[in-house]
């Protein structure tokens, strides 16, 4: 061939001047001749069908009368003559007769005569065929369809003998001249052409047609000749040779060209062929010698027969080609002879004898000729490639003049059609009073051809009309009609690369001609209703509407071979925008929201063209009438929307084509599914005629060129020659499978147009009833199936015009299960033409498991044969079916039998094992993925309908496990990743209402969300509430301010929306770009940003020996700095030391990902109290760093450790100077080897502390708090098997690490925070380090607020007392004396109270005293680490800290929240190693690319810095290198990045980019402040211009201006660090305000999460081993201390918090007797340092032996929130835990307390275990045994009195309770009060909270009285002991400072986590409590325990009434009071 086929252009490009083509034809040279073809007929056939059936030559009987001459429209031919008797008449338009006239009038005898001997036997397998339309005939101008359109095996090799190869087809007149044989129109080896010729059955007996004087195997008449035995039109001839026929019938109509009569008569006749007795011979296929039944089995159905004699479904109605070819028609019922039959009988009898004589010789010569042609074909096409039908057609010695005439007529036809369209457009414009867009055509003969085309659209002559069967003998009298059909048919069907007729036009098409057929359907196929077929007949073409999609439907130029300009010689040409059949008059397509570089290569016309393809994929007949239908308008709007989405989402033009074509294909597939289901139902009754699948037939399947019921005619898939040679065949269930050709290779795609050429070969369907079903067109534009396709099909990929598809696309016809996966399309992009040789030739590896070829269409999964699928899948199915758990799944669910009428309402798509088995054997599965989908559908249905505790549900779980275990190996063996149905972990939802409340799955919840973005800063507010907490909210909603009492910024309840926590996201899929197998994206470890070339599965990669592409975005390629280098060397050194030679297997990569400077702002209360008085700094500058560690596992990087730290340098003011704070630390347990995992973590942390020590930092701080339930610190979704450590275990972990640090010298010492405060003599909050995000700043805020409230309450109380004193002084006499005495007592009491209070506070600062109580409560959680010894500290302090590492910008790693949020959005989970690998891949890519956005633009082509920006497009930029080579329709303006000195690629250097930004910011600041017009700084003038431009720019608002975008990004950088109040930089103040708002929003959420964590921690508070500084009893710190009186306890782990599982909240104390169980001391109000009242105190009441009634009440009230008066820290409200079997029903679903808690709690209470080990300086005093006994008595007494303790109270309900109280106070009548109570009772939890509030207020005075009574009964021994301890109590009780402060710990909280002011009614109790507590402290420290945390327990009214009785039986326990 002269040119590679992939570079052939299509002829449907625009063509403006037909003369250009003609002039090009004039210069063509004749093709070289071939000697072996000299005896071959080179004249064209005149069959209107375009690809007729086989022809065989048969001598005519010599005695046959010849027709008389007549003038028939330009031809006057007489029988027996080879020359016309008169010249042709001139026809309209100036053309002298038909273009074929000269060929017909001057035939070449040598070329017209058949060399086959007269007696050639017809029974050979390879019928002799010299028709110019046949593949083994002469290489004439009209090639028949390729083998892809012809049933039967390829002609490339010998064919097996047998009855499957009929020699000739009956019912077609041959073409013969003189005494020569009649030429028969046959396919290769006698194949018939089902696309063009109908199969006519023989009668039930007698000789075959033409048995007299004809060979016995004469199968019928060829195109253009009369039926033997039928009268032939006078003068009719074929190929210039006069046939000798029998008597001339009277039916021949004068005025019709005889050649057209003969040509059209047999083709357009729908009668049974030769049904009278004269034709008793059966069709050869059904003769006994062929092994067929004696009778024709389907004559009554009018069946067609294929080349194997198998029945082919024929149309029930008139079978008209979509191009108007009358090739297929249906006959009348059996037994109804045609009107010509009687006259034809006699002629057939006369021909029978001559035919018999010539039969033997004909067969012999036919065999010889077949061998010669096979050799010639092999020589031309090369070994190993199947010969295409058209490759041996045309004789290269044909007369160039004749060839030119044919070419001229073809060009004229093409031009005339285009010209007609232009005229129509001109008329349309004229109707609108608009100037015509096209000039008038001046081409000669154009009008003539337009008349011919117009006539052909409505020409019914010679075709069956159901109302007039006599039309079968009519002849068309219009000139050029038949010849034009013939030429068009040849052009359409010719697939030869060296065709002398087509090749010149191919060359012309290689140049960009303006030649197209945009709307040929409007002229011929749609508006004209091609061939006169009534619209009502519903039969525009043989196939489904899906086949017609995208092409010119029902046009003259497309029959079963599809678009002639696509399917013919121009298949390979690029498809221009105006291509074929777009919807006319579409408005310009919508511009994309973001413009990309490749967008400018796609014109609007092309986009509209593709929109039309989408429309026609759904509604294939958009005629002008339908264009006015609103449904079609909606459909077009949908198509435009889809096209726009694809246009925007695609990364390049190829992907855009790929996405659109994938969409089209899936739409077509869905349409076909419904039709095929009907076909299969209809075929069931006729299975005896179906062809079973076989290897031979399998090779005939999957033909690209073949017409299928699946493909649209324009569905953009490439065509391979060998594919065209494989016709469809087989039964309805087998015609969906493809097989590999004999050579096992994918033939090179020679079609650069990636839409397939729809061929003329239809599936051989073995039951006639299915034909009618298949022929029913689906023209409804929006039926159910179509609607589903619109909504359920994601875009997938096929290439469109201009590019060669890398995947040769076979056609699949079968029921394909709808794919439910929501995957986006793969990155399959058809390679360019230059890549065709490399990419396409290897587009499919040879599969061992499932041999198949060629590759399926894009996004259609690999297609396996039915046998292979059964072999692989049946064993899995059998195991499932035999399982005991499969009982409910074996048969379909019978809703009536099971009495479940709602089953089908809930389950929309039932599935069961029996149905799966049937579909498997019916061939309805094309791949294993569809089988898996059905199994999972079956299981999902069971899980959806049945409850979790039902047997069916559990059976489904077990069956799913079995299925995965059995199916996974099978899927892997078939080339897939796995058989699992994988979904991402559902996100945990937190309730912002009650503490520790979570929103469970499938629960309803309410959410408030608002977001605003300005200046590139986005502020998002999102608050979620469970149903119960939402109901408890007041109508005004929640406060969005930091101060919860601020009512100015509220989110009302009406702004909340109700949602359900039921969202499940499934893992997306990627498709292999070659075999289209679906892999989970995470299994494939593929991200299209990292690997833009597309995904290649391991199967194809192995077969093709492709190396996995390099990942440019590895973590190891991120920049190093000093810190990361230091840590990496240390860790790898440690691993090497431990593993020696194995260390290289476990390389660790450590990188510092972010280094930024920030400031920690002081909170409001602290600022008001201390900052304004200059006692405390307002801000603390610090540097934050993010350090992450990676390990290479299985060759892939996996991130396993993350660390965020804050460094407060030497320039930071005290108390933060030279301190480092470990803010967050997180890990996932994927590090290998496992035994070194903990040590490596320790090395990382100790390495950082050592590094900080070397820099000059002196102290480090760690908060050892596990995350709360469902919370993550750094990594999203930890592995389920990785248990989040419980508090004690985590603290032990840190302690072990720090002890190791002490040993190695990196740590000097470490203490708990309480010990550190005592040692540092902390007397004011200003001495406590103040870290960003730490726990203590919030605690200080609360302490200050509480102290202020208490002071206000005291003043109110004093004022009240003073008022009473003043009132008492008014009386006289005795009463006055009594009052005076009373006042004196009150004053003395008040003074004593104040003095005692001061004596109890050693700091003299109420806030500090409260802090100390919190310190002791949480001392186990906070570590203070000294890095530098006190001796070396002065030397260290003398040197300022200088960080050797520069700043490193990273928005994603700027704190933990950004990365965590992005991971949740993108599903970057670390829940398994598989997902961790993928998440790390995406993380590393984002880290590489994070710095390349915002500041400068990047080139859309190469991603380098862009300097050219499109003014029209939203986002299109080019660099200098790409601009010359990239065409863009808009004007480009040159821009420069505002950042000088830094390139985008320098982001890896970190510092370089930062320095560039800083220089640019400095220039910006200077320019905004500079007033010098002649400033000598160059950057000044540049920045001034930029600033001025931004102020005036109108495009700045929508973000389309590149200059403004850069400036705003630069201003954001500046604003993050700007502190000037009057900054002149544009937008600085606005951006800072927005940043502050963003920070506040983030801080509120952070406070909420911290409160949750601390509340979870406090639920197990004290469950931690003391640090070494507080352990002095010699017990190992990691060993639990047994209870006091219960003996040694089990070695159990401490409680934990934060797991998604609930076990960390399930705690119950270890058993024991009541007193022993109560040995856990109750916490004091303020924590009471020195009293051994550790953090465990809150848990005491819930111990064994408590009143069951109290337990019940507690469990009843617990859901409403925490109790009051606990710990005093935000979120420290603690709930009592029980061991009584009644778990604590917190909203989070928490259970009882873990038994492991008790030892931990007791360790935290040295007062119970080791008197000398008390913290706070108490140890050493040595409490004696009586004191301990006293403590036990007090605890016993406490157990009796614990019911008197007030119930816990949910502080979040405080505002509502206050509102209720106000309503009660305002109520004046009893009815009003009842109304209030009635409303209150509607919300039970609020009613209970109100009751508890009342009980709390009433209980405290009673308890104070009880304590006073008990104190009076104390023993002298106890008094003596208390006197001895008074001195130490004064020091040990410093943290108490007055115990009242500790009570006000539970206050109403807003979502921000802040605490509101205390209710005054609550505050009134503190003075009362303070009156009694100091005396008790002095008397009995142990007695304090009985009163500890009085608000921690619930007390009902009955228990309150029983208080005196409870106290009386235990007088001994009251000692010490």
Swiss-Prot record:
Gene3D superfamilies: 2.10.110.40, 3.30.60.90, Bromodomain-like (1.20.920.10), Coactivator CBP, KIX domain (1.10.246.20), TAZ domain (1.20.1020.10), Zinc/RING finger domain, C3HC4 (zinc finger) (3.30.40.10)
Biased composition (Basic and acidic residues): 1-13, 834-854, 1349-1358
Biased composition (Polar residues): 106-116, 721-773, 1667-1678, 1748-1757, 1943-1962
Alphabetized GO MF terms: chromatin DNA binding; histone acetyltransferase activity; L-lysine N-acetyltransferase activity, acting on acetyl phosphate as donor; protein-lysine-acetyltransferase activity; RNA polymerase II-specific DNA-binding transcription factor binding; transcription coactivator activity; zinc ion binding
Zinc finger intervals, ZZ-type: 1494-1540
Main location class: nucleus
Biased composition annotated in UniProt, kind: Basic residues: 1378-1399
Mutant phenotype after disruption: RNAi-mediated knockdown targeted to the gonadal distal tip cells (DTC) causes DTC migration defects. Significant reduction in expression of src-1, tln-1 and nmy-2 in DTCs. RNAi-mediated knockdown on an mrg-1;cec-4 double mutant background restores positioning of heterochromatin to the nuclear periphery.
Boundaries of every KIX domain copy: 593-672
Modified residues (Symmetric dimethylarginine): 234
Post-translational modification, as annotated: Methylation by prmt-5 may repress the capacity of cbp-1 to enhance cep-1-dependent transcription of egl-1.
EC number in record: 2.3.1.48
Job description of the protein: Acetyltransferase enzyme. Acetylates histones, giving a specific tag for transcriptional activation. May prevent DNA damage-induced apoptosis by inhibiting cep-1-dependent transcription activation of the programmed cell death activator egl-1. In differentiated cells, negatively regulates localization of heterochromatin to the nuclear periphery. Plays a role in migration of gonadal distal tip cells, where it probably modulates expression of genes involved in integrin-mediated adhesion.
Entry protein name: Protein cbp-1
């Amino acid at each position: 061939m002269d040119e590679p086929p992939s570079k052939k252009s299509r002829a449907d490009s625009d063509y403006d001047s037909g003369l250009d083509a003609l002039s090009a034809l004039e210069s063509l040279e004749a093709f070289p001749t071939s000697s072996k073809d000299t005896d071959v007929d080179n004249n064209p056939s005149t069959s209107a069908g375009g690809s007729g059936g086989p022809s065989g030559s048969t001598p005519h009987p010599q005695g046959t009368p010849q027709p008389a001459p007549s003038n028939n429209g330009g031809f006057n031919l007489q029988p027996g003559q080879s020359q016309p008797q008169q010249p042709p008449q001139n026809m309209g338009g100036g053309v002298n007769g038909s273009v074929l006239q000269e060929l017909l009038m001057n035939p070449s005898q040598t070329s017209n005569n058949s060399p086959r001997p007269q007696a050639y036997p017809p029974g050979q397998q390879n019928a002799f065929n010299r028709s110019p339309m046949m593949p083994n005939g002469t290489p004439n101008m009209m090639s028949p369809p390729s083998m892809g359109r012809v049933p039967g095996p390829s002609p490339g090799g010998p064919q097996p003998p047998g009855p499957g190869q009929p020699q000739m087809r009956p019912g077609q007149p041959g073409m013969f001249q003189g005494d020569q044989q009649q030429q028969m129109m046959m396919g290769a080896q006698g194949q018939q052409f089902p696309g063009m010729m109908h199969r006519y059955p023989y009668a039930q007996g007698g000789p075959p047609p033409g048995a007299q004087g004809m060979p016995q195997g004469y199968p019928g008449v060829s195109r253009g000749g009369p039926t033997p035995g039928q009268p032939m039109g006078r003068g009719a001839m074929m190929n210039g040779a006069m046939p000798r026929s029998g008597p001339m019938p009277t039916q021949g109509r004068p005025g019709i060209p005889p050649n057209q009569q003969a040509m059209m008569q047999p083709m357009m006749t729908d009668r049974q062929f030769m049904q009278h007795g004269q034709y008793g011979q059966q069709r050869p296929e059904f003769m006994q010698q062929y092994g067929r039944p004696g009778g024709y089995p389907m004559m009554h159905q009018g069946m067609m027969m294929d080349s194997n004699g198998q029945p082919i479904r024929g149309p029930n109605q008139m079978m008209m080609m979509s191009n108007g070819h009358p090739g297929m028609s249906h006959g009348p019922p059996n037994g109804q002879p045609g009107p010509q039959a009687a006259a034809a009988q006699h002629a057939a009898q006369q021909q029978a004898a001559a035919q018999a004589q010539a039969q033997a010789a004909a067969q012999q010569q036919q065999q010889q000729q077949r061998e010669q042609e096979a050799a010639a074909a092999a020589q031309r096409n090369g070994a190993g490639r199947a010969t295409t039908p058209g490759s041996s057609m045309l004789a290269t010695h044909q007369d160039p003049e004749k060839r030119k005439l044919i070419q001229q007529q073809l060009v004229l036809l093409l031009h005339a059609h285009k010209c007609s369209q232009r005229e129509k457009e001109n008329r349309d414009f004229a109707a609108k009073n608009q100037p015509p867009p096209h000039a008038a055509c001046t081409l000669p003969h154009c009008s003539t051809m337009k008349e011919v085309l117009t006539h052909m659209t409505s020409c019914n002559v010679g075709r069956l009309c159901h109302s007039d069967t006599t039309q079968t003998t009519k002849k068309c009298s219009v000139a050029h009609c038949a010849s034009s059909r013939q030429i068009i048919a040849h052009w359409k069907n010719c697939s030869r690369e060296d065709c002398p007729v087509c090749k010149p036009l191919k060359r012309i098409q290689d140049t960009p001609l303006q030649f197209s057929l945009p709307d040929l359907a409007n002229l011929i196929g749609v508006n004209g209703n091609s061939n006169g077929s009534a619209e009502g007949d519903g039969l525009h073409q043989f196939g489904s509407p899906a086949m017609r999609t995208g092409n010119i439907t029902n046009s003259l130029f497309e029959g079963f071979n599809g678009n002639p300009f696509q399917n013919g010689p121009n298949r390979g040409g690029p498809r221009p925008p105006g291509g074929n059949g777009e919807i006319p008059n579409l408005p310009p397509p919508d511009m994309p929201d973001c413009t990309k570089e490749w967008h400018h290569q796609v014109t609007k016309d092309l986009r509209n063209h593709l929109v039309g393809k989408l429309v026609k994929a759904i509604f294939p007949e958009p005629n002008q009438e339908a264009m006015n239908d609103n449904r079609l308008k909606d459909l077009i709007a949908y198509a435009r929307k889809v096209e726009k989405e694809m246009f925007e989402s695609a990364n390049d033009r190829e992907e855009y084509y790929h996405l659109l074509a994938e969409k089209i294909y899936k739409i077509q597939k869905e349409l076909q599914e419904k039709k095929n289901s009907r076909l299969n139902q209809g075929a069931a009754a006729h299975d005896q005629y179906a062809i079973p699948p076989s290897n031979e037939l399998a090779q005939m399947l999957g033909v690209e060129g073949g017409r299928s019921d699946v493909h649209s005619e324009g569905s953009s898939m490439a065509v391979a020659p060998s594919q065209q040679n494989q016709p469809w065949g087989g039964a309805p269930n087998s015609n969906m499978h493809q097989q590999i050709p004999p050579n096992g290779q994918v033939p090179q795609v020679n079609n650069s147009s990636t839409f397939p050429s729809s061929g003329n070969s239809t599936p051989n369907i073995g039951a006639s009833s299915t034909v009618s079903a298949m022929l029913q067109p689906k023209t409804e534009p929006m039926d159910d199936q179509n609607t589903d396709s619109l909504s359920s099909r994601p875009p997938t990929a096929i290439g469109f015009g201009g590019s060669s598809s890398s995947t040769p696309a076979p056609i699949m016809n079968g029921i394909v299960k709808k794919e439910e996966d929501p995957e986006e399309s793969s990155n399959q992009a058809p390679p360019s033409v230059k890549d065709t040789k490399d990419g396409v030739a290897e587009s499919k590896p040879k599969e061992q498991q499932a041999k198949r070829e060629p590759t399926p269409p894009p996004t259609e999964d690999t297609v396996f044969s039915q046998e292979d699928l059964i072999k692989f899948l049946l064993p899995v199915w059998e195991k499932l079916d035999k399982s005991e758990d499969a009982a409910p799944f074996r048969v379909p669910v019978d809703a009536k039998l099971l009495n479940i009428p709602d089953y089908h309402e809930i389950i929309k798509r039932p599935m069961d094992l029996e149905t799966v088995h049937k579909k498997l054997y019916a061939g309805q599965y094309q791949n294993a993925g569809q089988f898996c989908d059905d199994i999972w559908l079956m299981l999902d249905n069971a899980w959806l309908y049945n409850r979790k505790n039902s047997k069916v549900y559990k059976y489904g779980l077990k069956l799913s496990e079995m299925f995965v275990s059995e199916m996974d190996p099978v899927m892997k063996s078939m080339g897939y990743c796995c058989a699992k149905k994988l979904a991402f972990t559902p996100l945990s939802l937190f309730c912002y209402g009650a503490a520790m409340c979570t929103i469970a799955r499938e629960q309803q919840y309410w959410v408030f969300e608002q977001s605003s973005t300005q200046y590139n800063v986005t502020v998002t507010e999102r608050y979620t509430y469970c149903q119960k907490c939402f109901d408890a909210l007041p109508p005004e909603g929640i406060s969005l301010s930091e101060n919860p009492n601020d009512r100015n910024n509220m989110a009302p309840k009406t702004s909340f929306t109700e949602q359900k926590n039921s969202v499940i996201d499934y893992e997306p899929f990627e498709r292999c770009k070659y075999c289209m197998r679906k892999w989970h994206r995470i299994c494939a470890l593929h991200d299209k940003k990292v690997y833009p070339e597309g995904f290649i599965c391991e199967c194809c990669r192995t077969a093709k020996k492709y190396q996995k592409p390099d990942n440019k975005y590895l973590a190891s390629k991120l920049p190093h700095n000093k810190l990361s280098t230091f840590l990496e060397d240390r860790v790898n050194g440690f691993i090497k030391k431990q593993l020696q030679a194995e260390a290289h297997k476990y390389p660790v990569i450590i990188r510092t990902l972010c280094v930024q400077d920030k400031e920690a702002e002081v909170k409001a209360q602290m600022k008001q109290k201390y900052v304004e008085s200059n006692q405390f700094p307002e801000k603390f500058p610090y540097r934050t760093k993010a350090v992450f560690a990676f390990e290479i596992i299985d060759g892939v990087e996996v991130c396993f450790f993350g660390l965020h730290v804050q460094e407060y340098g030497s320039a930071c003011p005290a108390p933060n100077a030279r301190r480092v704070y470990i803010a967050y630390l997180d890990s996932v347990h994927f590090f290998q080897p496992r035994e070194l995992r903990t040590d490596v973590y320790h090395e990382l942390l100790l390495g950082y502390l050592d590094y900080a020590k070397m820099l000059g930092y002196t102290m480090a701080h760690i908060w050892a708090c596990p995350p709360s339930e469902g919370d993550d610190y750094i990594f999203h979704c930890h592995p389920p098997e990785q248990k989040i450590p419980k508090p004690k275990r985590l603290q032990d972990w840190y302690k072990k690490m720090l002890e190791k640090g002490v040993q190695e010298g990196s740590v000097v010492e470490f203490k708990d925070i309480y010990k550190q405060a005592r040692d540092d003599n902390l007397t004011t909050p200003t001495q406590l380090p103040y870290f960003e995000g730490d726990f203590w700043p919030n605690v200080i805020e609360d302490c200050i607020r509480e102290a202020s409230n208490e002071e206000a309450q005291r003043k109110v109380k004093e004022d009240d007392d003073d008022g009473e004193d003043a009132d008492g002084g008014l009386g006289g006499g005795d009463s006055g004396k009594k009052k005076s005495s009373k006042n004196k007592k009150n004053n003395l009491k008040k003074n004593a109270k104040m003095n005692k209070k001061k004596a109890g506070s050693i700091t003299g600062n109420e806030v500090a005293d409260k802090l100390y109580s919190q310190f002791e409560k949480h001392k186990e959680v906070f570590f203070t680490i000294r890095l530098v010894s006190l001796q070396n500290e002065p030397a260290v302090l003398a040197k300022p800290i200088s960080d050797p590492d520069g700043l490193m910008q990273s928005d994603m790693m700027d704190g933990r929240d950004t990365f965590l949020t992005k991971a949740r959005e993108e599903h970057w989970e670390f829940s398994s190693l598989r997902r961790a690998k993928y998440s790390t891949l995406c993380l590393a890519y984002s880290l590489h690319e994070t710095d390349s956005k915002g500041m400068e633009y990047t080139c859309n082509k190469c991603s380098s810095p862009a300097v050219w920006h499109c003014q029209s497009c939203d986002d299109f930029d080019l660099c200098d290198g790409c601009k010359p080579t990239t065409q863009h329709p808009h004007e480009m303006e040159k821009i420069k990045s505002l950042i000088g000195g830094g390139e985008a690629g320098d982001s890896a250097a970190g510092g370089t980019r930062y320095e560039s930004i800083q220089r640019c910011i400095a220039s910006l600041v200077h320019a905004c402040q500079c007033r010098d017009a002649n400033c000598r700084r160059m950057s000044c003038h540049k920045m001034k211009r930029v600033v001025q431009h931004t102020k005036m720019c109108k495009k700045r608002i929508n973000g389309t201006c590149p200059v403004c975008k850069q400036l705003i990004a630069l201003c954001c950088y500046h604003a993050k660090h700007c502190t000037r109040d009057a900054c002149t930089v544009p937008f600085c103040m606005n951006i800072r305000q927005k940043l502050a708002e963003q920070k506040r929003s983030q801080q509120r959420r952070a406070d909420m999460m911290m409160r949750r964590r601390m509340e979870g921690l406090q639920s197990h508070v004290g469950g931690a081993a003391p640090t070494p500084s507080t352990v002095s009893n010699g017990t190992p710190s990691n060993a639990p201390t047994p209870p006091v009186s219960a003996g040694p306890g089990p070695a159990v782990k401490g409680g934990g918090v934060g797991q998604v599982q609930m076990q960390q909240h399930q705690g119950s104390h270890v058993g024991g007797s009541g007193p022993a169980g109560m040995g856990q001391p109750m916490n004091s109000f303020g924590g009471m340092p020195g009293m051994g009242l550790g953090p465990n105190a809150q848990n005491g009441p819930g111990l064994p032996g408590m009143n069951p009634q109290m337990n019940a009440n507690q469990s009843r009230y617990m859901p409403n929130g925490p109790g009051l008066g606990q710990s005093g820290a935000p979120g420290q409200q603690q709930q009592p835990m029980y061991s009584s079997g009644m778990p604590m029903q917190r909203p989070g679903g928490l259970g009882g307390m873990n038994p492991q808690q008790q030892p931990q709690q007791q360790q935290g209470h040295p007062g119970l275990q080791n008197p000398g080990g008390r913290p706070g300086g108490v140890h050493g005093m040595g409490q004696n045994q009586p004191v301990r006994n006293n403590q036990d008595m007090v605890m016993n007494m406490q157990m009796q009195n614990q019911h008197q303790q007030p119930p816990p109270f949910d502080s979040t309900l405080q505002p509502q309770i206050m509102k209720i109280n106000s309503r009660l106070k305002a109520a004046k009548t009893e009815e009003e009060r009842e109304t209030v109570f009635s409303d209150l009772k509607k919300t039970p939890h609020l009613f209970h909270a109100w009751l508890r509030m009342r009980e709390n207020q009433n209980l405290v005075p009673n308890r104070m009285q009880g304590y006073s009574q008990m104190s009076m009964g104390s023993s002298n021994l106890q008094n003596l002991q208390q006197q001895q301890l008074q001195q130490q109590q004064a020091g040990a009780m410093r943290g108490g400072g007055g115990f009242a402060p500790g009570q006000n710990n539970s206050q109403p909280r807003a979502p921000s986590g802040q605490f509101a002011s205390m209710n005054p009614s609550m505050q009134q109790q503190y003075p009362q409590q303070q009156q009694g507590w100091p005396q008790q402290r002095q008397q009995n420290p142990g007695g304090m325990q009985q009163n500890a945390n009085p608000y921690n327990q619930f007390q009902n009214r009955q228990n309150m009434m029983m208080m005196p009785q409870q106290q009386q039986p235990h007088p001994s326990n009251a000692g010490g009071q």
